[in-house]
Amino acid sequence: MSENWIDAAARDEVPRGRRDRHQYRRQGDCLYEVAGEIYATDNTCTHGAARMSDGFLEGREIECPLHQGRFDVCTGKALCTPLTQDIKTYPVKIENMRVMLKLD
């Protein structure tokens, strides 16, 4: 089985050093910087049709802008109600200053 890595963004397109808007939206996924590392999740909340790229990132937690549920962006784990389902995460690597995502 071959690996399916896609070029998601330039590394410098994922904002650094701010408490909000750490995320970068690319179609159906969302990129985040946490402590210098890049993480990727689906861009749609598992609870409702809210875009995670419109949420608020604090540390490792992204808060859904619709119902304030929070996910750990590093693991995808749903951390509080009303969330009952984890969010999908994607493996990330940096190649030639490009953020690459491994899709299933």
Swiss-Prot record:
<comment type="similarity">
    <text>Belongs to the bacterial ring-hydroxylating dioxygenase ferredoxin component family.</text>
</comment>
<comment type="subunit">
    <text>The 2,4-dinitrotoluene dioxygenase (DNTDO) multicomponent enzyme system is composed of an electron transfer component and a dioxygenase component (iron sulfur protein (ISP)). The electron transfer component is composed of a ferredoxin reductase (DntAa) and a ferredoxin (DntAb), and the dioxygenase component is formed of a large alpha subunit (DntAc) and a small beta subunit (DntAd).</text>
</comment>
<dbReference type="GO" id="GO:0046872">
    <property type="term" value="F:metal ion binding"/>
</dbReference>
<comment type="function">
    <text>Component of the 2,4-dinitrotoluene dioxygenase (DNTDO) multicomponent enzyme system which catalyzes the incorporation of both atoms of molecular oxygen into 2,4-dinitrotoluene (DNT) to form 4-methyl-5-nitrocatechol (MNC) and nitrite. Functions as an intermediate electron transfer protein via a specific interaction with iron sulfur protein components (ISP)(DntAc and DntAd). Also able to convert naphthalene to cis-(1R,2S)-dihydroxy-1,2-dihydronaphthalene.</text>
</comment>
<keyword id="KW-0813">Transport</keyword>
<feature type="region of interest" description="Disordered">
    <location>
        <begin position="1"/>
        <end position="21"/>
    </location>
</feature>
<feature type="binding site">
    <location>
        <position position="64"/>
    </location>
    <ligand>
        <name>[2Fe-2S] cluster</name>
    </ligand>
</feature>
<keyword id="KW-0001">2Fe-2S</keyword>
<keyword id="KW-0249">Electron transport</keyword>
<keyword id="KW-0411">Iron-sulfur</keyword>
<keyword id="KW-0058">Aromatic hydrocarbons catabolism</keyword>
<keyword id="KW-0408">Iron</keyword>
<dbReference type="GO" id="GO:0009056">
    <property type="term" value="P:catabolic process"/>
</dbReference>
<feature type="binding site">
    <location>
        <position position="45"/>
    </location>
    <ligand>
        <name>[2Fe-2S] cluster</name>
    </ligand>
</feature>
<dbReference type="InterPro" id="IPR017941">
    <property type="entry name" value="Rieske_2Fe-2S"/>
</dbReference>
<keyword id="KW-0479">Metal-binding</keyword>
<dbReference type="Pfam" id="PF00355">
    <property type="entry name" value="Rieske"/>
</dbReference>
<feature type="domain" description="Rieske">
    <location>
        <begin position="5"/>
        <end position="101"/>
    </location>
</feature>
<feature type="binding site">
    <location>
        <position position="67"/>
    </location>
    <ligand>
        <name>[2Fe-2S] cluster</name>
    </ligand>
</feature>
<dbReference type="InterPro" id="IPR036922">
    <property type="entry name" value="Rieske_2Fe-2S_sf"/>
</dbReference>
<protein>
    <recommendedName>
        <fullName>2,4-dinitrotoluene dioxygenase system, ferredoxin component</fullName>
    </recommendedName>
</protein>
<feature type="binding site">
    <location>
        <position position="47"/>
    </location>
    <ligand>
        <name>[2Fe-2S] cluster</name>
    </ligand>
</feature>
<dbReference type="GO" id="GO:0051537">
    <property type="term" value="F:2 iron, 2 sulfur cluster binding"/>
</dbReference>
